[in-house]
Amino acid sequence: MARRYWDINLEEMMGAGVHFGHGTRKWNPRMAPYISGKRKGIHITNLTRTARPLSEACDLVFDAASRGKHFLIVGTKDKAADSVASAAIRARCHYVNKKWLGGMSTNWSTTETRLHKFRDLRAEQKMGRFKRLPKRDAAMLKRQLSHLQTYLGGIKYMTGLPDIVIIVDHQEEYTAIRECLTLGIPTICLIDTNCDPDLADIPIPANDDAIASIQLILNKLVLAIREGHYSYLGSH
């Protein structure tokens, strides 16, 4: 896999607060190699140890996208949800930004059934069939559709398991990570100083609580995915 230049700038990362970790009492000793020191009771991430895996991750997703592979971006906490949806839409990826439903990937047949139901309800609503139903029945179907939109809206076009999963805050998304490990799906994870880097295929040490930090990391990955997509389209 060829290395490319992704304009990963240490000053830019510092400006976004990528280097700020958690309080020194809330840390995972396995993160020690990525920590450069302490400041006012919090750990500081060594940004050179962030730049390297971020560049590696960009190379990986570019290469995968250039071969037509599919991505899923996961980040369900409030500070990440909007950034995850925005990044996924720009990169034409699938996303989960509300709640990871247990078994979403390991019990794919059930998820697929829910997606078929979701698509059918959307089609019925667009064709105006809800309006021809009794009010009680129409209200029940609208509630079902709203529920499915909330939890499956970001994966409504998925037809199979993703090739790579990008995860924001792997403490929050532990269930998703365990499912990826079970299925052997490669993961790229933002890992803060309280995380276990060994659970990710490519751990990117970064502040996973600051919106600016999350957006910076996702923006780099999105750029690489988009360039990979263009390369794929240009060769087909």
Curated annotation (Swiss-Prot):
One GO cellular component, as annotated: chloroplast
Location within or outside the cell: Plastid, Chloroplast
Signal peptide range in chain numbering: none
GO biological process: translation
Keywords attached to this entry: Chloroplast, Plastid, Ribonucleoprotein, Ribosomal protein
Molecular function per GO: structural constituent of ribosome
Keyword Ribonucleoprotein carried by entry: yes
Keyword tRNA processing part of the UniProt annotation: no
PANTHER family: 30S RIBOSOMAL PROTEIN S2 PROKARYOTIC AND ORGANELLAR, SMALL RIBOSOMAL SUBUNIT PROTEIN US2M
UniProt record similarity statement: Belongs to the universal ribosomal protein uS2 family.
Name of the featured protein: Small ribosomal subunit protein uS2c
